[in-house]
């Protein structure tokens, strides 16, 4: 995990939304322990900036996470909004893009 991130901001609402898609809090947190790609999501950012992260869980499954970063005093916490396992087309695209980056 990025040393600037102090931890995760969980409550029953965001845990439930992630569980609805079959992704546990542990799987989501494990994605942030590994290399990930993060993209801003200006279309869905209302009031606070949302991001999309794609990466692999500790189990090796490809995960898409929608999250925001929340400041508390001088620390930043990741607040997952939703997460799901990526579809086959998304995995293929992710793997192709990752291969291009590795060749650089």
Model-derived features: positions:
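Ribonuclease/tRNase effector modules and their secretory precursors
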Residues: 1-104
């Amino acid at each position: 995990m990025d040393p600037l991130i102090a931890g995760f901001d969980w409550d029953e609402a965001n845990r439930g939304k992630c569980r609805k898609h079959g992704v546990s809090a542990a799987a989501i947190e494990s994605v942030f322990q590994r290399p990930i790609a993060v993209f801003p999501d200006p279309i869905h950012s209302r009031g606070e900036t949302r991001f999309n992260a794609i990466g692999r869980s500790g189990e090796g499954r490809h995960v898409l996470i929608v999250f925001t970063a929340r400041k508390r005093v001088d620390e930043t916490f990741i607040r997952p909004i939703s997460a799901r396992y990526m579809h086959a087309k998304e995995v293929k695209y992710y793997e192709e893009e990752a291969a291009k980056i590795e060749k650089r």
